[in-house]
């Protein structure tokens, strides 16, 4: 499962809550969490870019190229996953791993059980949408093709 346009779909209010949650878990709260949240708000709300002599301001979500973007997105997705997995009460895939906005999983669930899980995930947050691929033979993850042949996993990654 891949998040569709993760950086441009995280509403500020939904992203700042997990950021504050994880900052409050630091062993040493220095600088203070409220100060870091205010700085994050400035980055999110005052980000501008110039293109062909015009200046544009990012009004919502995370601007591409922002230094804090990947970490912010990971915290948001980690919090979202944790919350949705706690709330989902039906059978779920045995394996699911994610790298920022790209996920991969494996399961022995029936096709219908898997679709129930995917539909729950798809509808969990109004701004976050996923694309997905279901296959018994192979999937692509992070530009790598992972295949299941004769009971063994194999992978192929084209040369860079």
PLM features per residue range, with description:
Residues 1-120, 124, 133-141, 149:
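Conserved polymerase palm-domain catalytic core
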Residues 147, 151-160:
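C-terminal, non-catalytic extensions of nucleic-acid polymerases
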């Amino acid at each position: 499962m891949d998040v569709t346009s993760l950086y441009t779909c995280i509403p500020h209010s939904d992203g700042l809550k997990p950021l504050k949650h994880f900052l409050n878990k630091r062993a040493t709260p220095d600088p203070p969490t409220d100060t870091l949240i205010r700085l994050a708000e400035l980055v999110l709300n005052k980000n501008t870019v110039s293109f062909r002599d015009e200046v544009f301001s990012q009004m919502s979500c995370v601007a591409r190229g922002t230094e804090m973007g990947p970490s912010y997105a990971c915290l948001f997705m980690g919090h979202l996953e944790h919350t949705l997995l706690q709330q989902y009460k039906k059978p779920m895939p045995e394996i699911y791993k994610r790298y920022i906005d790209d996920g991969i999983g494996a399961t022995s669930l029936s096709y219908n059980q898997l679709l129930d899980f995917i539909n729950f995930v798809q509808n969990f947050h109004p701004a976050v949408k996923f694309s997905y691929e279901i296959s018994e033979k192979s999937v692509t993850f992070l530009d790598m093709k992972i295949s299941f042949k004769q009971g063994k996993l194999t992978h192929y990654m084209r040369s860079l």
